[in-house]
A protein has these predicted regions:
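C-terminal structural segment of proteins
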Residues: 1-148
């Protein structure tokens, strides 16, 4: 679990002389999978000031069965956001967007945003919210294209 793997900013449980060779992911449980990732950095290939990744699984009707959203670059650790929302890929987009924005904003309340010479905490929060919405939207669009 990521919560146990990261022990500090830029630090993991892996000793300095060790090398990570493999990461295993669970096989998706549902027929349709969508992913999205967005980040922002001061320069190309710099560490992210904020990043968001989404992984969504839906059944054959387009009902989302699993939505995972994580953010990074905004606090000491990358973290998964606890989202409490029901989404149907074929549902009303405006309604979905509104409910998603509300759910993401509520989930971000639990994050301790860092402030440093690169960005303020409030900037990181605003950007993380937008990147999270974009990542989820990309994942939903990917699923929508896959549905019959």
């Amino acid at each position: 679990h990521a919560e146990e793997f990261f022990i500090g900013p830029m630090l993991t449980l892996i000793p300095p002389t060790a090398c990570l060779f493999e990461i295993c992911f669970a096989k998706p449980s549902f027929a349709h999978v969508g992913t999205g990732f967005h980040e922002i950095a001061a320069r190309r290939s710099d560490y992210a000031l904020a990043a968001a990744a989404a992984h969504i699984e839906a059944d054959d009707t387009g009902a989302v069965q699993d939505l995972r959203l994580a953010i990074g670059g905004v606090s000491d650790f990358p973290q998964r956001l606890p989202l409490d929302i029901h989404i149907d890929v074929s549902g009303d987009k405006a309604d979905t967007d509104t409910r998603l924005t509300t759910a993401i904003d509520a989930a971000l309340d639990s994050v301790d945003f860092v402030e440093d010479m690169h960005a303020t905490a409030s900037y990181r929060r605003r950007v993380a919210a937008e990147l999270a919405r974009r990542a989820v939207d990309d994942a939903l669009c990917e699923i929508a294209q896959d549905l019959p």
